Amino acid sequence: NLSIMNKHLLITLITLFSFQRLFAQLPNGSIAPDFELTDLNSVTHKLYEDYTDLGYTVFIDFSAVWCGPCWSYHTSHALKDVYENHGPLGHPGVNASTTNDVMVFFIEGDGNSETCLGGTGCGTPGDWITGTPYPIICTDASSGFGNPGSIASTWAVSGWPTVYQVCP
């Protein structure tokens, strides 16, 4: 029966991709690579100096604009809610009653352009920028990266999306 074969194929694929995701991370207890990156608003962010050294837990969403599961996760607003309620006091989009202990970044780690992030081209399902209150970092060649995707490689990203939590 074709339906049973499709179910078995789906289960097999899910299992394979699940095991792949187990290896798409830095080992627990390891020290996350430091970075100094500039967001779409020309603000420079230093992971340790600006955030973890000051006590912030940092969430980093590595995604690709063409990735359907990335888009679904982004539009679930999970990280937006975290940022609005726990982000740095005084940052745009952060509630005045924030716990002031979290920072969130979105990194387009596959070398796609800001135009793609804005919803045009690259197979993107929509506009990633509008309504995103936390910093968005584009890693295409025009943003100063000699090797687009190098930050994703440094962070051992082998699939999209990959979300890291970096603790102080």
Features from the language model and the residues they span:
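Thiol-based oxidoreductase modules, predominantly thioredoxin-like and allied folds used
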Residues: 87-118, 131-146
